[in-house]
């Protein structure tokens, strides 16, 4: 069998994995096999959580808007506000509405009143 001269390919691959796993704790940052497995798990988690992050922020925005609208009037709810905004064709997304709710509640109250009229 002929000899294959690969140079430092394997060492370069392991070094890349070690650099990725350098912030992991314990054997996950030192041993090649466990660091490879942890790298795969970390990449799976980041891929999954990128989608989950979008859902979590949307839930947070909805909660903030709903809290401010309930302070304004007891009978007014988040779902009715969004429905009225769509009817009036006021195109404000939930992120912007949540920022307005935090920074300037009076502005959100005027938006609510405009959507009712």
From Swiss-Prot:
Keyword Zinc in record: no
Listed SUPFAM superfamilies: Ribosomal protein L20
NCBIfam families per the UniProt record, alphabetical: rplT_bact
Name this protein carries in UniProt: Large ribosomal subunit protein bL20c
Encoding gene, per UniProt annotation: rpl20
Domain of life: Eukaryota
A single MF term (Gene Ontology): rRNA binding
Family: Belongs to the bacterial ribosomal protein bL20 family.
Intracellular or extracellular location(s): Plastid, Chloroplast
Cited function: Binds directly to 23S ribosomal RNA and is necessary for the in vitro assembly process of the 50S ribosomal subunit. It is not involved in the protein synthesizing functions of that subunit.
PROSITE patterns documented for this protein: RIBOSOMAL_L20
Pfam families recorded: Ribosomal_L20 (PF00453)
BP terms from Gene Ontology: ribosomal large subunit assembly; translation
GO cellular component: chloroplast; ribonucleoprotein complex; ribosome
UniProt entry keywords in alphabetical sequence: Chloroplast, Plastid, Ribonucleoprotein, Ribosomal protein, RNA-binding, rRNA-binding
UniProt lineage: Eukaryota, Viridiplantae, Streptophyta, Embryophyta, Tracheophyta
